[in-house]
């Protein structure tokens, strides 16, 4: 393990030049990326997360190069599986693959169930992986299914079914079903509080988030979001809601894509696609029934989800992207802001950034803009770690026969 850790420190942190101070600071910090699509490529196309890939934005070699110490490992169940009610089966298939990949690469990455695990794994020179469900684990919010997923190692789950409303919580990107949360949605939140699971409000409607803040006894986490003041789209968060999330002790991870924070790129991507990136109307229009294997074949070409071909001249620079975080800090304070890249989930990163290997460029930009080192360490990872500790390290759940 010492040999692995020495190798980690010897790796170049980014292809582009950054200062020695930035390099040393990044190496010494806990870099906690709150949202990464780790295994969707492997599920549909095979392969090993431990091998460097010729395309895409994530694999373990590039994560190590980027200095990543912990990440929310997305279990992403796409909307394609919902009309046939395959969402729970697909969740289990992805968790099975995730655990298999973690075991196969146990010298590099390890499952983390709480903040103590993250710290222990990080000290050992490995990446700590927190399983986070993106999409619907069960569209009806079955608490038994939720408990079973907890037992399998899941420690975070989104309220909504990605960009679709489920039967207990509304999404920001679809027609409301329950006007925020219904009684079952409130029961899901109470059970997640009891279990010590992160309530991930990314993709949830503002109304659902407001109501979740009233019900939850624990802080809420937006693993990958944006600022509506900079780009007025459903997937970004208005300032007043950000303040409320922070007031409850939560944290907001900012997605790295230009689509979230740069209206010019959002308009470019929308014009070229003929629809906004969250539009899944083609799925709802499919002729049914379809087998799960047929759905797999329809979904496979989507992965890995790559960024757009928007011209470099339109893209934010790393420094300009850090300016987004500065605006967020001005609103909620430096203790409530984090990074949730969404790599391999389709973001168009800042100019000169191509993959998770390039995260050190953000640290360099923070220093260039005059950020003090304590603030940098908070935003890179300590804020997310603090909230994860608060949520997961209570007395622990009791399971009754």
Model-derived regions, located:
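Positively charged n-region of N-terminal signal peptides that target proteins for export
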Residues: 1-3
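Hydrophobic h-region of N-terminal signal peptides that target proteins for export
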Residues: 6-16
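N-terminal hydrophobic targeting/anchoring segments and the immediately downstream early-domain regions
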Residues: 15-179, 228, 232-401
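Extended hydrophobic secondary-structure segments
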Residues: 40, 193-212, 335-346
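Distinct, well-ordered alpha-helical segments
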Residues: 142-146, 208-217
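Active-site glycine-rich loop that binds ribose-phosphate moieties when present
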Residues: 179-187
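Substrate-binding cleft of carbohydrate-active enzyme catalytic domains
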Residues: 187-201, 207-211, 239-247, 327
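Short hydrophobic/aromatic-enriched beta-strand-loop microsegments
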Residues: 219-225
